[in-house]
Amino acid sequence: MPVSSYKAKQLIVMRRDLKMRKGKIAAQAGHACVEAVLMALAREDRLSDVSLSYNEDGEPVWIVVDDHGDPSPLTDGFRYGVAKVCVYVDSEEALLDIAQQGRDQGFIVSLIRDAGLTEFHGEATYTCLAFEPLRAEDIDPITGGLPLY
């Protein structure tokens, strides 16, 4: 499904300058994506308002409701798919700047700091970030100019 068909997309910003192994990149991106969604649910105390249903094809569909019992924007993301778009920056400073721009807009940003146990010579290192699932028109002003990873 092309990215333009999705109702929401989740941006992952990786630090390319770290030259992480492919498995490390996948793990760090996974941590960031999951944490950003959980943070978005917790922000409005929604963790208790999440339920699992199944569509006509037997596939799982997560339902998140708002204060009025209506599906929230996150439900559209779960129902119609959330495109994962991975872009990159080449420094910690650039990563932290993107994180701050997102926070300044009121977006949930999961900034991942690896403990350094398997890479980075034992030093804790910021590796990536992920935003909560957002509409393109909301996130593109911040990340639209970044190159795809």
Q: Where is each model-derived feature located?
A:
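Positively charged, small/polar-rich N-terminal and surface patches that mediate targeting and assembly
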Residues: 1-149
